[in-house]
Amino acid sequence: MVRCDECLRANPPTRVNCLYCAAVLPLNETTINLQKPALRPLEKWEQGYNNIILPPAANPPQELAAAALHEAAALLRLPPADLALILSLKTPLPVARAAAIDEALLVERRLGSLGINTCIVADAEPGTDAMGPAKVRALGIDDTRVYAFQTPEAPAIQISWSDFVLFVVGRLIVKRVELKEQKGARAENRILDAREFVTDETVVDLYTRNQTTPYRITANSFDFSCLSTRKGLLASENISRLIDFLRERAPHAQYDDSFNSVRKALDFIWPSEQQNISSGWRRERPGKYSIGSVTELSNEMQFLRYSRLRYHFHRKADKENDHA
């Protein structure tokens, strides 16, 4: 057992934090290899610490031994096949999301001993806006700059073509299920009406040189008048043409469309978020009441985290090139 220095209570040697007061437990030669991260699912409002697999250049080229793979998977509370998929993609991806920095450091140290190099990226990374991306509804374009409009009333944000550094493209998928149930005397409710809606739209985050918060364009919430004669009838066509046009005008900006190919691996650590909403009770007729509910599953936060991760490594590479 390990004694907590704060509350003086005994804790199992596998714990990182005190079971009673949450203080960090002291390490010694005996417990350093016994500690195991809890890696509990975080609430929506909690800020976590992400262990990110480093690019292939930072990891040995040989295949991970089966025993090491199973040990790493057990540490991360993942099926070995899921961890193998993450490693096979050979790109920076999350393998764990911890509630505390000490837990993330433990994961980093233990994975490093198995030959898997990682780094820690906090949700609340310096410069990250908690409000999310700046959503752009329309663009004005000339030879030197872009004029981004967030609302018809707000003044345009002026962005020089030379300021664009990264375009991250993905898909936003929202599944919405609406239920109307009749409450009965029995345990089970009778479903009166059920509807399911799915939206799937292309999204692009535009990162600029001096701002960490991206400008976001979504296909179904954008006025494509800036395309002029290139504008088509379908939003899915127009968003592709807009992205091509932006890349033509800013060829120096890095283009990343890897989100769709790694989305399955992201689900293991950054799953789509579910929101449950109740529309309340309604009296249908005397003695009969119904209740409505809405369940919405969205990958918007998943894409935002991945977009910020790509920008994190883009900025890191730029700093390394400047020092070289």
Regions inferred by a protein language model and the residue ranges of each:
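Residues immediately within or flanking Cys/His clusters that coordinate Zn2+
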Residues: 1, 15
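Long, charge-rich boundary regions
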Residues: 32-98
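A cross-kingdom feature marking charged/low-complexity
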Residues: 44, 48-60, 106-140
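Phosphoinositide-dependent membrane-docking surfaces
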Residues: 141-148, 157-176
